[in-house]
Amino acid sequence: MRNTISSKMGQVLIVLLLLCTVLCRTESALPSGQHSVLLTGRRLMGSGASGPVRSSQSSQAGGRFNDADPIAIDYGKY
């Protein structure tokens, strides 16, 4: 009984060490400027849209022109 517990604890320790090694190596592989780019992207995604989408923007993006279309949603109302 004691041998199985110690062997399982050894396996858990090895897995944790490997996980820490992999995480440290992947973080060091990222360039230092990459972190600021990720934070800027998160800020932009979190800010949301500022006002309703104009028809010229919608047509350039391939949007629909029909107001009765249930898929076309005006996010400026919300």
Swiss-Prot record:
Q: Give the protein's biological function.
A: Brassicaceae-specific phytocytokine (plant endogenous peptide released into the apoplast) perceived by MIK2 in a BAK1/SERK3 and SERK4 coreceptors-dependent manner, that modulates various physiological and antimicrobial processes including root growth prevention, phospholipid signaling pathway activation (e.g. accumulation of phosphatidic acid (PA), but transient reduction of phosphatidylinositol 4,5-bisphosphate (PIP(2)) levels) and reactive oxygen species (ROS) response regulation.
Tissues in which the UniProt entry reports expression = Mostly expressed in the whole root system, and, to a lower extent, in seedlings shoots.
Similarity comment: family membership = Belongs to the serine rich endogenous peptide (SCOOP) phytocytokine family.
- What is the official name of this protein in its record? Serine rich endogenous peptide 12
Predominant place of localization: membrane
**Residue window of motif SCOOP motif:** 50-64
User: Which keywords does this Swiss-Prot/TrEMBL entry list?
Assistant: Apoplast, Cell membrane, Cleavage on pair of basic residues, Jasmonic acid signaling pathway, Membrane, Plant defense, Secreted, Signal, Stress response
The subunit structure is: Interacts with MIK2 (via extracellular leucine-rich repeat domain); this interaction triggers the formation of complex between MIK2 and the BAK1/SERK3 and SERK4 coreceptors, and subsequent BAK1 activation by phosphorylation on 'Ser-612'.
| Chain span(s) of sequence motif SxS motif essential for MIK2 binding | 56-58
Signal sequence residues: 1-24
Proregion positions: 25-43
Q: From which organism does this entry originate?
A: Arabidopsis thaliana
**GO term, biological process aspect, one:** response to wounding
Q: Taxonomically, what lineage is the organism?
A: Eukaryota, Viridiplantae, Streptophyta, Embryophyta, Tracheophyta
What the record says about the induction of its expression is: Triggered by AtPep1. Induced by Erwinia amylovora, a bacterial pathogen. Accumulates upon infection by generalist herbivores such as Spodoptera littoralis.
Could you state a single Gene Ontology molecular function term?
LRR domain binding
